[in-house]
Each structure stands twice: as C-alpha cells, then as structure tokens.
Amino acid sequence: MAREFSLKDTRNIGIMAHIDAGKTTTTERILFYTGRVHKIGETHEGASQMDWMEQEQERGITITSAATTAQWKGHRINIIDTPGHVDFTVEVERSLRVLDGAVAVLDAQSGVEPQTETVWRQATTYGVPRIVFINKMDKTGADFMYSVSTLRDRLQANAHPIQLPIGAEDDFVGFVDLIEMQAHISKDDLGQDWEVTEVPADYKDEAESLRESLVEAVAELDEDLMMKYLEGEELTKDELKAAIRKGTCNVEFYPVVCGTAFKNKGVQALLDAVLDYLPSPLDVAAIRGQVPGTDEEVTREPGDDQPFAALAFKVMTDPFVGKLTFFRVYSGTLNSGSYVRNATKDKRERIGRILQMHANSREEISTVYSGDIAAAVGLKDTTTGDTLCDEKNLVILESMEFPEPVIHLSVEPKSKADQDKMGIALAKLAEEDPTFKTFTDEETGETVIGGMGELHLDIIVDRLRREFKVEANVGAPQVSYRETIRTAAQVEGKFVRQSGGRGQFGHVWVEFSPNEEGAGFEFENAIVGGVVPREYIPSVQAGIEEALQNGMIAGYPVIDIKAKLYDGSYHDVDSSEMAFKIAASMALKNAKSKCDPVLLEPISKVEIVVPEEYMGDIMGDVTARRGRVEGMEARGNAQVVKAFVPLAEMFGYATSLRSRTQGRGTYSMVFDHYEEVPKSIAEEIIKKQTGA
C-alpha cells in the first residue's frame, strides 16, 4: 500500500484544556466535519465518539487519550484526545510527548483556568507549538478579549487573535478573518453553510486595530518583515501567514481563533488554522536518542527511507482484539507481520496486525509510515515509554518518567471466582498505566492498589467492575507509615534452646544507631577474633533486615537505621544459621526499650492555586490539616500557596477545595519526605495497629 498522505500533509495534534472547556465536543465536531462521524455525539448526553470508556460517558470527562485519524483538505490529521483532570496528568504528558502541535481549548467565559496552566506548562516543557481555540462563544458571559488577556497575564503567552468574533452569547454568528479582512457568517445550524462577506461596518474599527497589532507582533518575529513594516510597506497575506506559521512552529507565537463547537461554529476555520500554522513532522527537530549500552547520541530524521524508530505511548486492553499498543513512528516504515527490537527492554517483538484507530472503530492497515500514529496488536513485552526500532539500527528514544503512587487502598474480591480474575485484571491495568501499582500486603494478605489520587483509584475500581467483571470490596484509603529510631544503643540478642538431641545456640551484641534521612538500612560487621564465625554473619544481617520489615512499635517498616555487629559467642555443635538469624531479630526487639523508636508519616508537597478572595480560608484549612505553609506567590490573578502537608490529612481534599472555592481552586500534590508523627497522633495509630 503506497503512502496516502505526504509527511508535509500530516499533522499530529492534541486537544488540551481545562476539565470543562469543551475539548471532547471540539474533537467530536472535527470528526464530524472531516467525514468520520455521521451523527454528532454530545458529551452531556454521554454519547461522544472519543469518550469510549463507559465511565467517561457517565462522568462526562475524558480519561484515556484515544488516538483518532481524520482527513481535511488533502491532509491527514491524527488527533490525540487528552484528559483535563489533575489526577490524569500522566496521560497528558504521555500524549504531549508524541505530538507535533496542539490546540488549547479555552472557555470564553473563564479564559485560562488553573488546569489550563498545568497542561500549558507541560506543553512548554516538551516544546509543543500551540494554537488557541476560544470555545463556548455562545455561553452567557462569553468574553473573547478577556480570554485573550488571560493568556497573556497568566501564561505570559505571546498570543494574538487572527479572528474577531461577530456577536457573543446568543448573538454569536461568526467571525472576521483578520488576515483576509473578510467576515464569515454562519447560515445554518450544522455550520455547513457559511457566507463570506465584507466586514460589518460596526466591526471595522476594532478589526483594523487588531489587525494592526497582529501585523506588528508578527513583524517582530522576522527581521526582513520588520524592515518592511518600519518602512511603511504593506505585508502581503502570504507573508503574514508564513511568518505566523514560523513563529508558531518555533513556540514563540500563539494564534487565537474563536467559535462554539457545541453550536457548530468556527470548527472548520480551526481545522484550516491547524493546517496553516501547526507543524508537520518535517517542521519539528529530529528526535534524539541513545545507542543502547553506550553514551553515544544519535538522531532520527523523519523520512520513510530512514531506519525504523517509534515510541510506544499507550497500552490498552481492547475487549475485541486484546492488548493494543499505540505508537508514534518517528522515522522509517513498519509492515505488519515483521519483527522489531524493543530497545528499552532488549526484546524482540513481532508486529501482528496494525490498526489505524478512529475513536471506537478500527481499520486494519498493512504499513505505517514515518510521522504516523497507529496501534499494534500482539506485542508481548512493550509498555508505555518503550522504544521500538529496526533490529540492525538500535536506538532508545528519551523515555518518560512517571511519579510514584501517593495513595493506597485495599481491594478484596467478593468471591473465589473474582479472586482469580482480579489478579489478571490488575496486571493488565498496571501495564496500561505506569502510575498505577499493585502488590500484596504480606501481613494481611490483602491486595493493595496505589495511584495518583482518589479519582484515579475510583476509576481503576470502576474498570475492574465493568471491563473485567470483578466485584470487589474497597477499603478506606491508607497512608504508608514508616518507623525509625532516635537514639543509639548496644543490645544483646540471645537464642538458646537445649532440650535433648541437637540444641540451638546464637548470641550477638549489636549497636543500633540512627542513619541519615533517606539513607536506608546499613549493616556493619565489626567482629574481630571470630567470636561469631564468618559463615553466620549473613544470617545475622538477614535476621535484622527481616525484623525491620515488621516494625518495632506499630508493625510498619523501619527505615534509616544502622546496625553494627560487634560481639557475640557461638557453640561448636549447637550453633546454626537459623539460631543466629533468630538471635539477631531478638536483638532488634530488645532495642525497642533503649533506642527511642518513633513513627514517621509521608509528607506531601502541595501547591494550591486559588483566586485571591479565598486565600484566608485556604490558609486556615492548610494549618488545620497540620500543614506548613512554605511560601506564596501571585500567578496572574490567582494566588499560589506552597505547603508541606501530611498525606493522611489530604484525603477528600479535592472535594473540600472544590466546595471552598466554588470549583475555582486546583491543587497538585507529590510525595516529598517522611517526618515524625506528633506524639498524640502516633499513640492513636499505634493503638489501632497493635490493639494495645
């Protein structure tokens, strides 16, 4: 199968936004106008084409970035839908990593919202060019110029309108194209029929003044144009367009367009802007990588004649075809049925079928080309962030880093049948999502799942029930406490058993002392003169390490502790590895009364973004949660509070913050370090754990 669209005519874009800016509806309309969907699916009726997981349809939010392919005016546009909720930032990062450009959707009433800032920052980190679509122009309170000003104030973005809306709220009927200086007026409900006319008289002055500032801003990006502009020459439309494209591709300029996806206005013009201003794979710098096992850096240029290199950016379990691995091809081509090397894991993979995905239907293709996004069926060892490449030209493209889970809860299957299914289901979910972890608690035998926040785990439990038909009881969220010691002490551990036949004899003296924070466990053998024979030393270390896992006061693992074995004795006949192991664990038990053991709790670094008027309330709440405010800063017209707060106090915070700020506050939280639990609280935890 020959290549259908050239690299120059390919666009890989993402649609990014705050949770309710209308991102999914915008994607939906793009699919409608590009002929991929015959009936428009509405998010608030729960039938959107992109939101294909049941929970997404119920909650009306987008969780998984589905990759879809569409065609517009002889170009292929691959669209990745990204979630806008703070618990899913890993999905956003993952999709930004493989995009060449993005459309940032804003709500015309709110402008830049806090989650927009988060996503915008992530896009800046990855150097992703953006155009801005100010959506919901039909909404009460819609204000185009206010929204543009929030881009400049809150994001310090060099953003300029290339359209001016005609009317607003219920009177929004179209826009003035500031480059062509023509008005586009919508003539029907589906937005298929547009009339292009002269700019209405009452919009002329504003349109001319906006065009003037657009020309000036564009001229600043290009020396030749600047000279022409200063000499009073008129810039041609083609020069303007070329300069806007260059500025956008260099991430120095952000063109702004407007519309209402829900009312079908402005989406075709948005698609035109995607073709005009966002980069093709040829406009983006060649991707860098390393030759496995060396420090040698190599680049992969976009082109079908180059060696094959691709990045897997999403793994999903599909009810019909099994495991799907979404990947972006950076160079070369790939045929179904061929073999490639997973350079990250150093494994050979056979590519079974290759599918081009459209939100929830799929088309089988035999070849993918450079710049394409597709999904492969049948990959065994590939997970998110892995590089797939030609077996003779190995390369590892930069990988993605994922944060550790901050919240855990236990899940207990309701029946024996659920037990077996649950293990398989959790393994599949962990494969799809690198920020989700699962393990068995050795003491209680419970299965524990960990993730990035409460919504994250809610959705995992929901998927267990729906997709994998596993019924499970869910425990309350739990914090991972730790223990350590505050004073050094020398303690004895002696295990003697003599009752006919061969006895047991192990005897050690160990000095336990606090280690530096984060240094973990250190063991030192200071035996001289063979008072404890060399072959028993590893058993002493193993005995202490095992005992540390079971805790000293409340059964939580002991961290940051040194153990120095400096004396002891043995018996020629009765001593054994087991006897010394037990003696060592008894030494740790005896240290409890001498070493001043304490309980530690995880402390999260929390950043809360709220409008000024809620500051007092939020600060008071942070203090009430035993938090320590480290600093504050203004960000646009919002305030950012930076604080350290115990994780145990942060459960339910998303809901609490939402109600305190009428949904205008957002927060992000990452684990930072462990700190001692205040005595009164520690006593309660110990009592609960030990039943004493």
Swiss-Prot record:
Molecular-function annotations in GO: GTP binding; GTPase activity; translation elongation factor activity
One GO BP annotation of this record: ribosome disassembly
Keywords: Cytoplasm, Elongation factor, GTP-binding, Nucleotide-binding, Protein biosynthesis
Subcellular localization(s) per the UniProt record: Cytoplasm
Transmembrane segments: none
One GO cellular component term: cytoplasm
PROSITE patterns: G_TR_1, G_TR_2
Pfam families found in the cross-reference section: EFG_C (PF00679), EFG_III (PF14492), EFG_IV (PF03764), GTP_EFTU (PF00009), GTP_EFTU_D2 (PF03144)
Chief localization: cytoplasm
Domain tr-type G: start-end pairs: 8-282
Domain of life according to the entry: Bacteria
Record-linked InterPro entries: EFG_II (IPR041095), EFG_III (IPR009022), EFG_III/V (IPR035647), EFG_IV (IPR047872), EFG_V (IPR035649), EFG_V-like (IPR000640), EFTu-like_2 (IPR004161), G_TR_CS (IPR031157)
Positions contributing to GTP binding: 17-24, 81-85, 135-138
Family named by the database record: Belongs to the TRAFAC class translation factor GTPase superfamily. Classic translation factor GTPase family. EF-G/EF-2 subfamily.
Protein name: Elongation factor G
Source organism (scientific name): Shouchella clausii (strain KSM-K16) (Alkalihalobacillus clausii)
Role summary: Catalyzes the GTP-dependent ribosomal translocation step during translation elongation. During this step, the ribosome changes from the pre-translocational (PRE) to the post-translocational (POST) state as the newly formed A-site-bound peptidyl-tRNA and P-site-bound deacylated tRNA move to the P and E sites, respectively. Catalyzes the coordinated movement of the two tRNA molecules, the mRNA and conformational changes in the ribosome.
